[in-house]
């Protein structure tokens, strides 16, 4: 699995971006959001149980990510038509404000090192900085949904470019190593 300090791989994938038939699909590639932070999360399968809870929460907090100049991108190995059908079928997914990328060839999923032995993506999350460097990587067990608020908290911490202690939240004090070393 790729980790902190690695470059995020190049990709060009079809995404479901709308339920309007003439605007439903768009090609998204590694340069689409160049110069922005990206939160790229993978889910195992469409039409499942935990996945829509996570996707809906990323959608609910999308404005918070956008306020931090971060583009949310969701990815699974399902095709774009399955994404479309799922969005249309599931009330919590109909108004998603971010692209659902189709990695049907499993190229990005494999390049990130999150393709499971069962042929589907693991429940992985990456925060990628504007220089395309991974600053955060996490995988949870398939039976455990991720905490999207924690992903946002980590993004906030990364964007301070300062030392953030345990349980730090936006607006809280960061650490000053020089003062701490001096005993102040």
Predicted regions and their residues:
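Chalcogenol-based redox active-site neighborhoods
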Residues: 1-184
């Amino acid at each position: 699995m790729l980790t902190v300090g690695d470059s995020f791989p190049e990709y060009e994938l079809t995404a479901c971006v709308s339920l309007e038939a003439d605007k439903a699909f768009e090609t998204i590639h590694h340069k689409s959001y160049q110069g922005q932070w990206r939160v790229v999360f993978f889910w195992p399968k469409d039409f499942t149980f935990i996945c829509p809870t996570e996707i809906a929460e990323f959608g609910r907090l999308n404005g918070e990510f956008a306020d931090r100049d971060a583009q949310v991108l969701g990815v699974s190995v399902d095709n774009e038509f399955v994404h479309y059908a799922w969005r249309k079928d599931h009330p919590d997914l109909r108004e998603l404000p971010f692209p659902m990328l189709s990695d049907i060839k499993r190229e990005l999923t494999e390049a990130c090192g999150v393709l499971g032995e069962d042929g589907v993506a693991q429940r992985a999350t990456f925060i990628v900085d504007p220089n395309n460097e991974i600053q955060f990587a996490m995988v949870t067990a398939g039976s455990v949904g991720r905490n999207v608020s924690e992903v946002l908290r980590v993004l906030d911490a990364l964007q301070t470019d300062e030392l953030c202690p345990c349980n730090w939240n936006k607006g809280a004090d960061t650490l000053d190593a020089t003062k701490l070393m001096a005993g102040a």
